[in-house]
Amino acid sequence: MIAGIAFAVLFAAALLTVPTLPGIDKPGYDIVSHVNEHSGAMRMQSLLVTFGSLALVVVLGYARDRLTGPPGYVFTIGSAVVLVEVFIATWFTAGLALHPDQLGSATARTITDIASMWGPILTVADIMVAVPILLAANDGRFPRWLGILAAVFAVEQLIETITIIGPPASFISPGGAMNFYLGGPLFIVFFLALGVALSMEQPAEVQE
C-alpha cells in the first residue's frame, strides 16, 4: 500500500533529520544550544511527521476494517492514542524551535523533559495496536509473517516500558537510546509491514 510506504519514508526522514535532543542528564543550556543550531531542521521534522501521520491514518483505517469484536475496539483506541501522542510530542518539540533566540535554559529543560516521556508512554498505545494485529493474523486475516512481526513489536514495546523509570545517562533513560534507536525504527518497520500486508489479497475463507 502506498500509504504505508509514504508513512515509512516520511517518518524515517523525520527520525534522521535532527539529532536527538540532549538527554535528561544534560543541563538546560545544552538544549538551548541544540535548538539554536537545529531550529530549522526541527520545524522541518514536524512537517514530515505531520504528513507522515496522515499516511499512517490511512493504514490504520484499512487495518481496522479487517478486525472484528473486542480486538477491533482495542485497535481503534490504540490507534487514536498513538496519533494523539505523536501530535502532542510534536507540539512541544516544534514549539521549542519557534523562538530559539529567546529560549531560556529552565524552560528548555522543562519542555524537553515533557517531550522525553513521549516514547516511554507511547509503548502502551503501540501494544494496543500490535496485539489485535497478532490475533487477526492467527485467524488468517493477515499473513503469518505480519503476526510474527506484531508479536516481536509488542514484546519489544512491553520491555521498552522500562524507559518510563529508566535512570539518566543510560540506554533505558526516558527519550534515550532505547526509545530512539530501537523503538523508533521498529515502530516504522511495523506500520510499513502492515501497509504492505493490507495490499495483499485476503485468504478466501476470511473474506466477507
Q: How would you describe each model-predicted region?
A:
Residues 1-208:
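Hydrophobic, aromatic-enriched alpha-helical segments typical of multi-pass transmembrane helices
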